[in-house]
Every structure is written in C-alpha cells, then in structure tokens.
C-alpha cells in the first residue's frame, strides 16, 4: 500500500500570499502525514501559466498530479481541496478524480471548507475569534469570490452564522456572486446599526489574499493611494464610509 495526498488550490499569482496560505497548508499536511506522498496542484490554467512565466515554477494541474502519483505506484489517494465552497471549481475537481477511479485502489475527495451545517458554525467561531480585536466596534465586511453555481447561497448562510456567533454587524459581499457590495451598502444605510461616515473593516473571505483582495477589494488603497472607484473600498468611500483593508487570506488563521 502506498498512500498519497493531493492538495488542490485555484492558485494565486502573488508569491507572498501563496507562501502564507497554500504552502503553509502543504507544510502542515506533510508534518501530519510524513509517510504519505504529498503533492500540490493548481487548478487554474491562467495561474499555472503566470507562475511559469514570472517565477519559472512548473505547477501541476490536478490531472498531471494524479498521473504523477499513478507512475509512482500510489495505491490510495486522498484529494484535499482548499476551496471555500462546493462550487464550480470543486465539482470540476470531483469529476477529474472520478476519471482516475480505476487507476488506484481507492481515491476520495474531501469536502470543501463549507459543506455541512456544523462547518459554518466552526468557521464563524474561528474567524470571529481571529478578527474581533481588529474589528472592535466597527462593521465588518468579508469579500467572497461568488459563483453562478447554486453554492453561491453558502455566502448568505456564512453571514448568518457569523452574526449569530459574534452578535456583531457583519456582512459578506461577493465579487462574482449574487450579493454585491452595493447590496451591502444599501443594507448598511437602511439598517438599525447604520454608521454612515464611520469606519468599516474590509477583509477577504478567500483562502489567499491575491488579485481579488488587492484589486477588487482594496483597489490600491493598501499602497496608500485613493482606492479605485470600482473596488469595494472605492464604493464604500463614495457612499460616505471610511474603509480600512486587512489584506489577509483565511488560510493565515490557524483556527480555520
């Protein structure tokens, strides 16, 4: 019997956050399972190509990693996705794994971060306990990726779980999902705890703080500049709020 673990992420073109989040997870897995073959894969072709061009790193796709394991004589594979929700990327990964069912004695794909009701409660506790000192009395907005998949509903469920645990004014807005930053701003202005002209804390609800966090969320604000008008920070500023950005992926929180 030869066991292996395949860690799959969408990937990021930001080396620093890759080390703090994805590589950190891989190090933990290798430490926990020293006898297993541990490989990493990047599901995004765009990210793989960028890593090769900019950093001369040959990142494997999930299929390439599974092929490598097959050649190494691996018999049992555990696929560990780092996806937050069970959306399009996670379903593609499951389909890729199914094609290798006959190549190994056993291959199994673990759940995404948010798969069961208890997951939401656990993540809510871990996130709030990690962030509450920075948040203080101010509203907190988490930026999720969002998706056309039905799993987009996970973000609203996560917001509810966070509010229930923290008893605090917390919102989740997405870049590509149904809940936009405009929706959140409207709720903030009409809600009983509306704090127009007040500070608002912005941080990613994503594994890594990469392109979306730096551009779609902060919009250049993290470099001391005025945020881009189309960014979350820019739209909050235009609505009369004072956004403060925490550029940190949730993979940096040990409790998560």
What are these regions (language model features)?
Residues 1-256:
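Active-site-proximal alpha-helix that buttresses catalytic centers in soluble enzyme cores
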């Amino acid at each position: 019997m030869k066991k292996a673990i395949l860690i799959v992420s969408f990937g990021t073109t930001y080396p620093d956050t890759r080390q703090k989040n994805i590589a950190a997870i891989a190090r933990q897995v290798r430490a926990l399972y020293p006898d297993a073959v541990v490989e990493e894969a990047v599901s995004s072709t765009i990210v793989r190509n960028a890593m090769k061009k900019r950093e001369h790193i040959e990142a494997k796709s999930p299929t390439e990693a599974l092929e490598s394991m097959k050649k190494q004589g691996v018999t049992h594979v555990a696929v560990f996705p780092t996806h937050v929700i069970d959306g399009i990327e996670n379903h593609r990964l499951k389909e890729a794994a199914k094609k290798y069912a006959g190549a190994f004695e056993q291959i199994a794909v673990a759940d995404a971060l948010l798969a069961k009701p208890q997951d939401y409660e656990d993540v809510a506790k871990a996130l709030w306990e990690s962030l509450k000192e920075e948040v203080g009395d101010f509203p907190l907005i988490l930026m999720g990726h969002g998706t056309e998949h039905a799993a987009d509903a996970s973000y609203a469920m996560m917001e509810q779980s966070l509010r229930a645990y923290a008893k605090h004014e917390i919102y989740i807005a997405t870049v590509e999902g149904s809940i936009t930053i405009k929706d959140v701003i409207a709720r903030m202005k009409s809600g009983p705890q509306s704090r127009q002209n007040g500070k608002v804390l912005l941080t990613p609800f994503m594994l890594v703080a990469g392109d979306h966090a730096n551009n779609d969320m902060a919009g250049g604000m993290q470099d001391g500049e005025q945020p881009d008008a189309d960014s979350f920070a820019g739209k909050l500023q235009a609505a009369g709020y004072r956004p403060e950005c925490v550029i940190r992926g949730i993979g940096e929180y040990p409790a998560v």
